[in-house]
Amino acid sequence: MSIKEMKKLNEFNIPNNAINIYGNHPAKSALLNSNRNCYILCTTEKKFDYWNDFIISNQVNIKIVLLESFELNNLSNSNNHQGIVVFSSKIIKKKLSEYLKKLSSKKTRVLILDQLTDPQNVGSIIRSAFAFNFDAVCLLKNNTPIETSSLIKASAGEIDKIQILEIGNLVQEINILKKQNFFIYGLDGEGKIKIQEIDKTDNRIALIIGSEGKGLRNLTKQNMDGLVKIDINPECNSLNAANAASVAMYEISKN
C-alpha cells in the first residue's frame, strides 16, 4: 500500500488485523453478514453509484472511500477486484455447542473439516457446502488456515452465507453431536459404505473430511458411526479433498 493510500485510509481507524475482501459477490456477502464487522468500502468513481445504492437499499452503515483502480490493485494484491474492496473483521465464529442449543430443525447437515490446511481447498469446500444445502461448516480452532482474502475469494463469498462454527477437541465435539442425535460419517478411501448407500432419512448427519495428505486421523475414525467412500476409477489413486467433499455432499443432499 502506498503512502498516499495509507493517508486516505488512516482516518478510519481500521484495525491491524482487518482483512480486505474484493470482488462483487464476496463484498456483497460480507456487507450483509451480521457476523462480520465491515469498516470501510473502497471503490472507484465509476462504481460509486452502484455501491452507494447497494448499501442504502440494504441499510448497511459504512463509509465509502473513492480510489483509483490501480490503488485497489495494491490494496487487494489483485487486478481481479472488480472495482470493490471492503475492509472487514474476520467472521465471528460461534461455538458448536452454542449452535446446537438453538438448533430447531430436525433435518440438519453439518460438515466438519479435520486439519485441512490449504486455503483454496477450504474456500472451495465451503462454497460447495452452501451449494448443496449444508447448514454449517465446522473448522478446528487449530490446524486450520486463517481467514484470508484468497480463502474468501475461493468460496465466492459463500463463507458469509453459511454458518461457520469453531470447534476444539474433535472427539469431544463428535460425542456432543451424537448426543444431539447426529449420525457421524467420515469420508475415507478405505470406507466400507458407499456414499450413495448411507441412510439419508437420518434427520441429522455430520460429515467429516480429513486433511489433504493424511486423511482422517485414527482416533477420529474410531468415533465414527461409519466410514464412507466414493466409487472412482480403480486406476485413479484418489480425488483431492475439495473434489471428494463436493461429491460426498452432493450425494448426501439428494433425496
Show the residue positions of the predicted features:
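Short, glycine/polar-rich helix-capping loops at beta-to-alpha or helix-loop-helix junctions
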Residues: 50-52, 144-150, 214-223
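N-terminal positively charged helical leader segments and presequences
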Residues: 1-101
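Structured adenosyl-cofactor binding patch, chiefly the S-adenosyl-L-methionine
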Residues: 28, 33-34, 131, 152-158, ...
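RNA substrate-binding interface of SAM-dependent RNA methyltransferases
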Residues: 101-190
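Active-site/ligand-binding-proximal alpha/beta "capping" segment
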Residues: 185-240
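Short beta->alpha connector loops at strand-helix junctions that form conserved
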Residues: 68, 114, 140-141, 162, ...
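A short acidic, often aromatic-flanked loop/helix-cap motif at beta-alpha or helix-coil junctions
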Residues: 69-75, 92-94, 170-174, 192-194, ...
